[in-house]
Amino acid sequence: MPEDALDNVTSSLHDVVVVGAGPSGASCAHWLADAGWDVVVVEKKSLPREKTCGDGLTPRAVRQLADMGLEPLVAAAGHRYEGLRAVGFGRELELSWPEHPNFPPYGYTITRFDLDAIIAESARQQGARVLYGTEAVEPFEAMPPVREGRLGSASGVTVRDVATGRTAEVRARYVVIADGANSRLGRTLGAARRRDWPMGMALRGYWRSPRHDDRFIESHIDIRDANGDVVPGYGWIFPLGDGRVNVGVGLLSTDRTWRGVNTTRLMDAFLAQADPSWELSESTCLGPATGGKLPMGLSVGPCLGDNVVLTGDAAGAINPFNGEGIAYGYETGRLAATSVATALERGDADALEGYSDRLSSSYGEYFRVARGFVRLISEPKVMQACVGVGMRSDWLMSRLLSIMANLLRPDDLGSAELGYRAINAIAKRVPDGALDAVLAALDDRAPAVASSRG
């Protein structure tokens, strides 16, 4: 980063400083800058850069990209696909994305190497100043929370030039924390993850494949070892359209054996059962797999302080149903931008309260249902009974896809919408912790559950 670039942003008070140029940070900066506010984005890495991800964009993400005017760029750099191929329990179903008044019936696959650079550049073109190679070290002039259930506040962030080690302060009226799943700034100001809520763990790599331009992304619901026994986890193969496929495995902390699972062995088991036509072998592998853990279901909080908001992965804004985070990064970044802009327009920080309300109304009930669902299907007997039976019906799995991808129609009480309402009505009456007792009763290893659960 040129030295004068840091000088230019440290000499004045800005409207907003956004920490992180990933999906939520770049989205927030795009919308704030588009509205004419003085925005500075600090990003530790230099974009483009590699980022561990499944590289899949659902119709929800495409809608946000279209609203930003960026779908043509993503379409040119990525690969369009039409739906999900579900594989499991001896069956294979091709499920097209549902027709929806607000979302397109297709998605894209595109590497985060390309995608994140497109969004960050868009924020810059809207007028945001984006400082690459600049690490946010700590909140500047941090103050403790004024009341329980709130984050602390800050007058900006102290940053460090990664290349030179020089430090400086970027001062701003509002601070948006979008620094990812391991949010250091969020923790410093009082954010913490609810450890009894789902945490995802995933591993992914790239392979050359003759099916790189397949029209469906593929999800494997059950993975089996060499003996045919079910092992905890799920797998995916996402065609990228450029000669490569993104291949990965995932696991949720709701599975009682997750701490003892070796993800490399899980990947090996998945590769062994993938259809040979994908040609996933040691000779077609393009490098070592990488992975990480992701908080889900808005499991991180508080998300709001006097002049601070948490957004995207930093807030745990990942769908527990399917592990999707990019769409919710764009959406929560936009929600944060709306709330911050309102506070700036009114000259009243109390207007920031709308952010919590917007998160709750947008995702509160849905993520609650999702948390209950993933708890249940982590029990093999429930998985066999529910998903195993569901795989016998294209009709049923198509409805389940609408629910899991959060693509329920607001204007129609169809079978998927009615099914979700019924599940939601039940979930409202069952406390999160109550499911643990039910699962323990189903588990032959019930006495060991309490001691193994974190």
Give the positions of each predicted feature:
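Beta1/beta-strand and adjacent pyrophosphate-binding region of the FAD-binding site
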Residues: 8-22
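Glycine-rich FAD pyrophosphate-binding loop
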Residues: 33-53
